[in-house]
């Protein structure tokens, strides 16, 4: 079986050595080169054409952000960013994902993370997963935005209620998918949007802030007890489950720190299943790119107990990881499976 060929780019000799050891200890992975800065790394990527690259965010000479941009322009390969848990690190990481990185790994204790082995299983898992992703150059990705998409199917299902709520679940590749969907929704959209994106604490705030700066709608990290408003998207904070509950005639956010569900907190299952208790609302659920099957069980509960749900899933054509959508499709829970570019217009169509 062919090994996954990886390049490790980090300015710390200690981090290069330990990350290389972590990867080389997996029989499925071979580290073919290491690099101490972005410029050296770019040259080795062009020379060796690896299957995947791990890239530190903060480096001298050419930092991780500049290196990522050059790699995606000149020799696109899947990139996994390594980031610190600081606010600046989170902001840079979200920017990197938006600029083409496939995923990120959080260093437990800063740039030189002596306890990096605490996340060694995550490093191997994400590197192997990233190696299967087909990445596009920056030019290809921007051109794709303007390509025509397949005709959206006509839905022969009338709205049962006057009010609606949109819910979205996503994981790997989610920040870029959310950017595509949310930036195409109009400011006056007649529904609140609740979102679970698998992400650690700190990073969801940076994601919400970035999306808010480029979307017509408002985007914010959800706060416990706040009343949902149309035209606003609420992203579950990392480390908290998010549910929706009735408060009088309104809907409100409920956050809790109950144990992770199947390894996830926030959990898409938890969000979707909470919607079965919301009466007199049309519900539009979307499952976007992501690894695993989070969302399927919750959607099943929702559809068993609520007849006013329309379910969408991102197709394999555009999903960076076709795991979560595929699980829901295979369970027979999805009404419409479509490319990412078709989803915003269908959401709007269902709300008008």
Swiss-Prot record:
Domain CheB-type methylesterase: 163-352
Taxonomy, superkingdom: Bacteria
Gene: cheB
Reaction equations catalysed: [protein]-L-glutamate 5-O-methyl ester + H2O = L-glutamyl-[protein] + methanol + H(+); L-glutaminyl-[protein] + H2O = L-glutamyl-[protein] + NH4(+)
NCBIfam families: PRK00742.1
Protein species of origin: Oceanobacillus iheyensis (strain DSM 14371 / CIP 107618 / JCM 11309 / KCTC 3954 / HTE831)
Protein's name according to its UniProt entry: Protein-glutamate methylesterase/protein-glutamine glutaminase
Residues of the active site: 171, 198, 294
Free-text comment on this protein's domains from its UniProt entry: Contains a C-terminal catalytic domain, and an N-terminal region which modulates catalytic activity.
CDD domains: CheB_Rec, REC_CheB-like
EC number: 3.1.1.61, 3.5.1.44
GO biological process, any: chemotaxis
Statement: the UniProt record of this protein carries the keyword Phosphoprotein: yes
Alphabetized UniProt keyword annotations: Chemotaxis, Cytoplasm, Hydrolase, Phosphoprotein
């Amino acid at each position: 079986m062919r090994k996954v060929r990886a390049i490790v780019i980090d300015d710390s000799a200690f981090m290069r050595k330990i990350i290389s050891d972590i990867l080389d200890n997996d029989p499925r992975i071979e580290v073919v080169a290491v690099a101490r800065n972005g410029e050296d790394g770019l040259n080795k990527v062009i020379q060796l054409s690896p299957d995947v690259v791990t890239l530190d965010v903060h480096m001298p000479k050419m930092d991780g952000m500049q290196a990522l941009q050059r790699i995606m322009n000149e020799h696109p390969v899947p990139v996994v960013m390594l980031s610190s848990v600081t606010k600046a690190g989170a902001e840079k990481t979200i920017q990197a994902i938006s600029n083409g990185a496939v995923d990120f790994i959080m260093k437990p204790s800063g740039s030189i993370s002596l306890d990096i082995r605490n996340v060694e299983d995550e490093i191997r898992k994400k590197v192997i997963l990233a190696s299967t992703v087909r990445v596009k150059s920056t030019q290809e990705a921007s051109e794709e935005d303007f390509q025509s998409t397949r005709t959206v199917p006509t839905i022969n299902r009338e709205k049962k209620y006057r009010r609606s709520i949109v819910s979205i679940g996503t994981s790997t590749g989610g920040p870029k998918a959310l950017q595509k969907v949310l930036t195409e929704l109009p400011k006056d959209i007649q529904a609140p949007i609740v979102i679970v994106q698998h992400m650690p604490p700190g990073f969801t705030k940076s994601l919400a802030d970035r999306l808010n700066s480029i979307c017509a709608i408002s985007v914010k990290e959800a706060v416990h007890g706040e009343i949902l408003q149309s035209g606003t998207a609420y992203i579950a904070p990392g480390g908290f489950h998010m549910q929706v509950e009735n408060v009088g005639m309104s809907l409100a956010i409920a956050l809790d720190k109950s144990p992770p569900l199947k390894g996830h907190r926030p959990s898409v299952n938890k969000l979707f299943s909470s919607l079965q208790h919301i009466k007199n609302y049309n519900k539009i659920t979307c499952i976007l790119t992501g690894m695993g099957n989070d969302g399927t069980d919750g959607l099943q509960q929702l559809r068993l107990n609520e007849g006013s749900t329309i379910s969408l899933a991102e197709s394999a054509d555009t999903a960076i990881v076709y795991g979560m959508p595929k699980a829901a499709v295979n369970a027979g829970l999805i009404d419409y499976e479509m490319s990412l570019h078709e989803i915003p217009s269908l959401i709007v169509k269902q709300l008008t």
